[in-house]
UniProtKB/Swiss-Prot annotation:
A Pfam family recorded for this sequence: BFN_dom
Gene3D superfamilies: Bifunctional nuclease domain
Signal sequence coordinates: none
MF-aspect GO terms: nuclease activity
Native source species: Mycobacterium tuberculosis (strain ATCC 25618 / H37Rv)
Superkingdom of this protein's organism: Bacteria
UniProt GO cellular component terms: peptidoglycan-based cell wall; plasma membrane
Protein name: Uncharacterized protein Rv1829
Residue stretches making up the BFN domain: 1-129
Family matches, as InterPro entries: BFN_sf, Bi_nuclease_dom
Length: 164
């Protein structure tokens, strides 16, 4: 199981479908996960540091976890079946709750816990976008990688990632 970082939310055209883009913390694979509009907004708002005047659903969940005296330890994306990703919220006291990856990531960002992906999921749905240079990865190269990936996302559909 490897740790991933949230790259951000992209929008697949022409369907206008949001895609959550994760990248291995210690690798070059990206994991695209198609998600709903409201979850995409929740993730984007948190990444941008926007504080809503009233708690959104994922803020409420964060607050409930704390109010009930528990702590979220990590988020795990654990499976991919027929194009659907599955995740678990891992709490203290060995409590595990199944959740959608989009909700799990939105909560993880708010709580500040790591996100992990099972190797089998990365092997099945991860995309390798190699660096153009073996030298130090510069900001320009990383931006170019993301731009190439955006172009790739524009050319694929969720059906391309369904298991055969």
């Amino acid at each position: 199981m490897g740790e991933v970082r949230v790259v951000g939310i992209r929008v697949e055209q022409p369907q206008n479908q949001p895609v959550l883009l994760l990248r291995e913390a210690n690798g070059d694979r990206y994991l695209p996960i198609w998600i709903g509009q409201s979850e995409a907004a929740a993730i984007a708002l948190e990444q941008q540091g926007v504080e809503p005047p009233r708690p959104l659903t994922h803020d409420l969940i964060r607050d409930l976890i704390a109010a009930l005296g528990h702590s979220l330890k990590e988020v795990r994306i654990v499976d991919l079946q027929e194009g659907t990703f599955y995740a678990d919220l891992i709490f203290d006291r060995n409590i595990k709750v199944s959740a959608r990856p989009s909700d799990s990531v939105a909560i993880a960002l708010r709580v500040g816990v790591p996100i992990y992906v099972e190797e089998a999921v990365l092997a099945q749905a991860g995309l390798l976008i190699p660096d153009e240079s073996d030298e130090e990865a510069t900001t320009a190269v990383r931006e170019d990688e993301v731009e190439k990936f955006k172009e790739f996302l524009d050319s694929v559909s969720p059906d391309d990632f369904k298991a055969t």
